[in-house]
Amino acid sequence: GNTTTIPFAAQHHGQSLRDVVRDYHQRAAGKAVIDYAFHLIISDPTEQVLGQELPALIADGYISFKVYTTYDMLRLDDYQILEVLALARREGALVMVHAENHEVIRWLGERLLEGGYRAPKYHAVAHARLAESEAAHRIIALAELLDVPLLVVHVSTAEVADEIRRAQDRG
């Protein structure tokens, strides 16, 4: 059976990572009957977060975190992602990335809505293969620039799987 779970603890804009971890531990306190830890979701990489909070949390054992290139409340721009990747390299942490091109998805979604295409099946149309492959290629390039390991998550296209394989072959 399962003896450990590692869910995501999500930071929201303006929120301290220490507060996020404390809140998630409080949610589990007295309820968890198995071991648990947290992957952190970084959505507001301020100087305070990157300079103090995240290094301290990594030292405490929170060695993996996730960033997004899409979703209004979660996405980071390339500069912010570079800052997170640089910190991960320095501190020996692992960055996971949900890679999709936000603007492509937004543009396609708006066109679909304008055309009256509102059924749930059009969600997949708005999240086109190109949106994933472009963002994954860009994120892999940023990780290669800094020579830092990266885990691209939620891979749904052969193009991205091939891109990851090529990056692994390059080392």
Predicted feature locations:
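Metal-associated gating/positioning segment near the N- to mid-region
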Residues: G1-K31
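Structural detector of well-ordered beta-strand residues that form the stable sheet scaffold
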Residues: T3-I6, A37, M96, L151
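Short N-terminal helix-initiation segments at or just after the protein's N-terminus
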Residues: P7-A9, V33, Y117-K121
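Active-site mouth loops of central-metabolism enzymes
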Residues: A9-H12, A37-L50, T69, A124-L130
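Residues that form or flank phosphate/diphosphate-binding pockets in enzymes
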Residues: Q15, Q48, R75-L76
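Short acidic, glycine/proline-enriched helix-loop-strand junctions
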Residues: D19, I34, E91-A93
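A glycine-rich helix N-cap at a beta->alpha junction
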Residues: R27-I41
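Histidine/acidic residue-rich metal-binding segments in metalloenzymes
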Residues: Q52-T69, M73-G171
